[in-house]
Amino acid sequence: MAAAMTFCRLLNRCGEAARSLPLGARCFGVRVSPTGEKVTHTGQVYDDKDYRRIRFVGRQKEVNENFAIDLIAEQPVSEVETRVIACDGGGGALGHPKVYINLDKETKTGTCGYCGLQFRQHHR
């Protein structure tokens, strides 16, 4: 339980509502720092006196609120018939190198290391 609580704290989901969510549910998104500045997908946020804030003088910091991790989390787990699946991220110039994912165990969900898509073998 301590590990689950630590993970919840990392996601800022320690309330009762967070514990009632299914274990596979993930909640990511744009967070705001204590100074009111939006935090990027890498966790980048600067103090008021940080010299790197010079980039944002006279304009606001723009943060894309569609983080890739959120978009991947919305994708359902793909049920496949075969024991080994090949993922190339869509192929062509928009894809990634082809990787083969073993789906041997009944409860195992294989995840592509490049794009994060998840696959599960459909057992009859």
UniProtKB/Swiss-Prot annotation:
The keyword Transferase does not apply. Signal peptide: none annotated. Residues 1-28 form a transit peptide. Gene3D superfamilies: q5lls5 like domains (2.60.260.40). It is found in: Mitochondrion inner membrane. The modification N6-acetyllysine is found at residue 98. Keywords: Acetylation, Electron transport, Membrane, Mitochondrion, Mitochondrion inner membrane, Respiratory chain, Transit peptide, Transport. This is NADH dehydrogenase [ubiquinone] iron-sulfur protein 6, mitochondrial. It comes from Gorilla gorilla gorilla (Western lowland gorilla).
